[in-house]
Every structure is written in C-alpha cells, then in structure tokens.
Amino acid sequence: MASLKDIRAQIESTKNTQQITKAMKLVSAAKLRKAQNNIVNMRPYALALRQVIADIAVTNKVSHPLMEKKEQVKNVLLVVITSDRGLCGAFNSNINKFAEAYYNSNKASLEKIDFLFVGRRGHDYFARRGIKAVDYITKLDKDISYELASKVANRVMNDYLEGSYDEVRIVHNEFKSAISQVVTAETLLPIDLGMTTFKKEADTASNFAVDMIFEPAPEQIIKELLEKHFELQVYRCMSESVAGEHGARMSAMENATNNAKEMINKLTLTYNKLRQEKITTELIEIVSGAEALKG
C-alpha cells in the first residue's frame, strides 16, 4: 500500500496536470473563436464568387480546364489535412483511417494515388506504412493564412493542368461545432459549380448578362476567378480543419480536467482514510502503553 507521502505526491502531481489541461482548454477556446470567425467571414464572399463564375460560364458558354471532367479517372491526388500536434482526441486518427480506407479500396482500380499532407500527424501515420508524400506542409496551426492556402492551391493546380492527375480530392474534418467534427472527402478538381442549377436560373432570368461587354474577355475573367475560387476552397478546408482541431482539443482538455478532479477527490479520500487509520493506530499504541505502565 502507498504511504501518505506517496499519495500526497500523487495529489500534487495531478493538481499540476489539472492546471495545465485547464490552461490548454482556455487557449484552445480562444483559438477556436478566431478560427470560427474566419469561416463565417469568408462564406458570403465564397458564395458570391461562385455565383459570379457560374453566371458568366452559363450566359457566355465559357469553360476552362479546371472545370472539365476527365472521361476516365486514373490518377488521383489525395490532400490530407491533419494537425501537427496531438492531445485532441480522435481528431487525427479519424482522418488517417478515412484516408487509408479510401487508398485501400481504390488502389486496385486506379493507376496512381499520390498523397499531399498538410499536418505532421497524417504524414507520420502514412510514413510508418511505407507511403511517401509528393509534398508535406507543417505548422498549419501557427501559419494558417490565405498565403499558405494559395501556395498549396497553386502547387495542386499546376500539377492538375499539366495532366499529372485526373482528379484531386481533399480529406479533412468538416467543422460542425466545438464538440462535433465530421470527416469529409471533397472533390477539389475538377471544380463543380452546380452548373445545372445556375443554367435553369439563367434561362428564367433576364438576359442582362448576355448584353454585357467584358473587359478583358470572359475566358480570361473565368480563369482568374476560378483560380481565386480554388484558393478560397483550399483555405476554407484548412480553416475548418484548424477550427475542428481546436474544438477537439478543447473538448479533450475539458475531459482531462474533469478526470483529474475526480482522481484528486479519490486520492484525497484515500489519503484521509490512511491518515485516520494511522492516527487511530497511534492512539491505540499510546493507550496500550499507558495501560501497560499502570499494570
């Protein structure tokens, strides 16, 4: 049985851990609010940009290689977004298992599946399984910015336009709430703007767009806007992943703090029982010694 000194040391150690987990929870909560604001602020712009592209494409019958589906998909690039750090529950393992399941179920039917990892946890997981990445980006939590997303997007776009891949998919945690993240796989390229819906709207609407004069040409406008749209989608996925990471870490640290509190209560109860037993034993020894002296 542990001594009073050992139990006292365990209580102090658990209290120190509790302080750390509580602080991490507060930090994650602050970062989560910032990430949520990024997501909320970009949505109106993203929707407006998507509508403008679709309107121009439908009314002027303009297309672009980024929008054209390949007849047969043989080469796929899988962009996997995880975190650099742990202590966020099953956040990373869920993404890695999802991506691994996709790889195992499609590697026989596809000629090539390449991986681009954003976040160290995904890279390390697949590296242990002998799968190498075509690119590997870390420090997502610290350097999350539109510039970083643009860098990733341009790398992916260039590979796609050069014909290296027929399809680009991204696996990430879609942010629902602080306690809910859903692993999602989206097709990034070719870009799907829901052209059927926009065409119906264009057919029933006025013909103002048809009579507009574009400068530069619609083809050039579509090119610039599609690239901006793609960069924005990559940034959105990164932002949702970061928000999900902070939400998962906040939840995990809250559970850890509560568990530490329960452990402290149990250890304190055990400490008090042992101390009471020790005091009782000492009193019995004193009384027994006094009785022996009387006798």
Swiss-Prot record:
Keyword Ribonucleoprotein recorded: no
CDD domains: F1-ATPase_gamma
InterPro entries named among the record's database cross-references: ATP_synth_F1_ATPase_gsu, ATP_synth_F1_gsu, ATP_synth_F1_gsu_CS
Gene3D superfamilies: 3.40.1380.10, ATP synthase, gamma subunit, helix hairpin domain
GO biological process, one term: proton motive force-driven plasma membrane ATP synthesis
Pfam families assigned: ATP-synt
Membrane topology: Peripheral membrane protein
Keywords on record: ATP synthesis, Cell inner membrane, Cell membrane, CF(1), Hydrogen ion transport, Ion transport, Membrane, Transport
Subcellular location(s) per record: Cell inner membrane
GO MF annotation, one: proton-transporting ATP synthase activity, rotational mechanism
Cellular component annotations (GO), alphabetically ordered: plasma membrane; proton-transporting ATP synthase complex
PROSITE patterns hit by this protein: ATPASE_GAMMA
Family matches, as SUPFAM superfamilies: ATP synthase (F1-ATPase), gamma subunit
Free-text function comment from the UniProt entry: Produces ATP from ADP in the presence of a proton gradient across the membrane. The gamma chain is believed to be important in regulating ATPase activity and the flow of protons through the CF(0) complex.
Record's subunit section: F-type ATPases have 2 components, CF(1) - the catalytic core - and CF(0) - the membrane proton channel. CF(1) has five subunits: alpha(3), beta(3), gamma(1), delta(1), epsilon(1). CF(0) has three main subunits: a, b and c.
Family, as annotated: Belongs to the ATPase gamma chain family.
PANTHER family (UniProt xref): ATP SYNTHASE GAMMA CHAIN, ATP SYNTHASE SUBUNIT GAMMA, MITOCHONDRIAL
Name this protein carries in UniProt: ATP synthase gamma chain
Gene this chain is encoded by: atpG
